């Protein structure tokens, strides 16, 4: 039989020393050790197939149960997986909106939150605040509520994304023009100064009324500034 030439291993992000190594080679410098080979042979890989046709809540619960060890996923990162499985095009539109410059400028979250898909979560909340009949802040299980509601919107398939994108951009253009990066930060009336991190509660309080009356507030920017400041009084 023809002898097959064995290719060397290639490195990974977390195992760079694998580069150029062989499973078993006479040259010890480029070969895995006996102990390393035994460890690999005895290791187990858990594979669970989550069917696209499965109930969405069951999928979310399964992702949560699997979300142990290794790199921990944020609730929004898990939610992204479910949204992609349900409607990839819908996910891409949410993702594109999350990259809008004045949205990012108006919602200055931490680098860690950004890496954990925090901006995309705020876009999800934008839609839920505009379309949901329930009070987001009163939900007993907040993350499950967000997942259920965004999947319900996907199922209904009645969102005019061009119109929503226009309202979204007008909203955050206006917020950044009027409040700079301070619209969702606590306002101190005595010091006439905003400070601290972005407050989710402020976002949930401001967005519904502003988006419903965006044309009015575009013509009445001083009133908008006062309305936002009153949220923190």
Predicted regions mapped to residue ranges:
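C-terminal subdomains that position terminal phosphate/3'-OH groups for nucleotidyl transfer/ligation
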Residues: 119-233
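Basic- and aromatic-enriched surface patches that contact anionic nucleotides/nucleic acids
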Residues: 2-144, 218
